[in-house]
Amino acid sequence: MFRVGSWLYGKKPAANASTQSLDSLVELRDPATLILNDDVDGAEAGLAEGTSTFHNLGRGVVAFIRATLGFEQDIMRQASERLNEAETSASVDQHRAQHNSHAPNTYHSPMYSPGTEFALCQAIAQLMSAIVGVLNESLTESIKAFYRLRKAYITLDAILKMEQKYMEESRSATLVESTTSGSVPSSQRHSSSNLQSSSSSISSAKVKEATADTLAAPSKDTDVNERLADLSLSGEAPVAEDPGQTPTPINTDILDHDPDSDIFQNQIDVFVHSGSNFCFGVLLLLISMVPPSFSKLLSIIGFHGDKERGLKMLWQASKFHNLIGGIAAFAILGYYNGFVRYCDIMPDSIPGKDGDVQGYPQKRLELLLAKMRERFPKSQLWLLEESRMSGANKNLDRALELLCGEERSPLKQVEALRVFERSLNAMYLHKYELCADSFLECVDLNSWSRSLYYYIAGSCHLSLYRDVKETDSAKAAKHAELAEKYFRMAPTVAGKKRFMARQLPFDVFVARKFAKWEARAKEWKVSLVDAVGIDPIEEMIFFWNGHSRMTDEQLQESLQKLAWSESNANTTWSREGPEEKAILKLLRAAVHRSLRKHTQAKEMLEDILGQDRTLFKGHLKDDWICPVAHFEMAANLWMERPTYIANHSGAKQDSDKESAGPADAKDALQYERERVRKCKEYLEKAAKWESYELDARIGLKVTAAMEAVQKWESTHPTV
């Protein structure tokens, strides 16, 4: 069988880095992608056959995917070890490639300096190691993660500069050729073309030499520290180290080139381009999403995200038919069907425009998902994404149906995700028994937040207890017993998992809630289930933003469930203080907002915000009420804008709005500007709020909302 190098060069190549890179990339292309088809054994077996840097990285990526899907400590340790091995191997191969760059038969990329593919392998390993480190329970590992992140950035920045320079030279060459061909004799045009080609080659060589210096030793502490102050993930180049050099923004024209473009004829260039766009895109996107308290820390050390550019780079990476393209597609679908659906204030969509990446480009997402389902037909991972997309577009019944089939994924982490998503969909649909059973199944499949799983299972049986309390005492007793059983189990497993050495937010929430109910039960001399306040399932639906996925009928069902608290069936309502009553109003306001009844929603929120905030502070109290009420008020104001269009197909449109504002265009703009101004005021208050329970979770919404407001202001400047 012919080797790839022989086919490319016409004769048997010498053993050099470039031909080895080509051979290794082709060898692992199919085995590596098997992980995205739920065939982990096939992926591991195929990757075990080689010892190259690319095979080492492939094994690390497989472990990384499993680690990020399941958050299990043993898998994360395995991923960390494999990625470290890949990073070390890549460093050795990079130096060898640079040393042997002038050997016969060596491939010389028109864009990248020798050894760039190995520098990218290091950056990928460093980035994935950083993510695993942040997910690790150790604070030390989390700190090390940021150091790896800095090193990866420097490498990726250098690679993108090569692409930028190549595109600039290509445009210059084209411009000179078109200019000379129109007014100069053919002999002179030929001479001019040669001169331009020679000049361009010399310039390109200088750029490659300069960037090769950066890539040669990206791990040196002195180099990292010197460049730290200049780090920026906003899509612009760092401050030039040479005073005479003027930094220019990274050119985006290369993102318009598809995989069949002439500049991607070599597999090494394909790997470098798709890989660097994926990695840098992930960096830009993740850092743009962090909560306000954490983003301040990142900005101090020079990290600033750019969501729009990050998404464009991920979309570009997803075009390529390799492992990186598949992972990029998974990241894109996860972002839009997960994060975007979790947030309530997002930038306005631009209908029919491919460049619209910050809204919810539904048609584009459907095409991407269809392509992935075709590439990986056996994978439950993409079926899971189809379910998420259905839920995001207010078709929860279809979303649940997709996850209730008999087929199971052989990959435990994917199966755990499937059951978890099924649990959430059942919760949104008020299918309590299915929800409880599914969350209990999660306990056996995943160890990430078992306290939350038990808590929600207990809450489901509490709802069933309340439903039959006055009509079937036997069933009521059974559900009360199960509810108390799972409630008592929840705090016993809380705190087992940590994120950056801190307890998981919902673990803290669950432990406090149980302690609060237990104290009330003793004080009121009632059972634990009768000491519970506002429906905890409705509270969970709110925290997981289930209302955005629900139809009007399903939202009305939530209102009916909330009405139980004030009904005669609730014998403890007269004992409730302002805290539980505020939670009831807040949850009702959230449902009314989703029903587009903003006047009623704001009235309820104003009543909460008019109270003394100290009423909601103290031991065992829900201190999240006021900051969340501020965010909810901001969301109502944002949705009241005349130009607001929800980012999903099941949304009500302008004709269904409670109020679309003034009809006159000038008055409408002024009305919208006023809505945005007030929205921003409430968001700023929420962002500056003191530490409170679940602040990191709510902070994600606040960060996304502030970015959306800033984008609106940039497109609607005041005269």
UniProtKB/Swiss-Prot annotation:
Q: Per the record, where are the segments of Low complexity compositional bias?
A: 186-202
Tell where it localizes.
Answer: Cytoplasm; Nucleus
- Claim: Cytoplasm is one of the keywords in the record: yes
State the UniProt keywords alphabetically: Cytoplasm, Nucleus, Phosphoprotein
Q: Does the keyword Phosphoprotein apply?
A: yes
Q: Which GO terms describe its cellular component?
A: cytosol; mitochondrial outer membrane; nucleus
Record function comment: Inclusion body (IB) resident protein that interacts strongly with lipid droplet (LD) proteins. Involved in LD-mediated IB clearing after protein folding stress, probably by enabling access to the IBs of an LD-stored soluble sterol derivative that acts as a chaperone in inclusion clearing.
- What's the protein called, per UniProt? Inclusion body clearance protein iml2
Which species is this record about? Neosartorya fischeri (strain ATCC 1020 / DSM 3700 / CBS 544.65 / FGSC A1164 / JCM 1740 / NRRL 181 / WB 181) (Aspergillus fischerianus)
Instruction: Please name the taxonomic classification of the source.
Output: Eukaryota, Fungi, Dikarya, Ascomycota, Pezizomycotina
Tell me the name of the encoding gene.
iml2
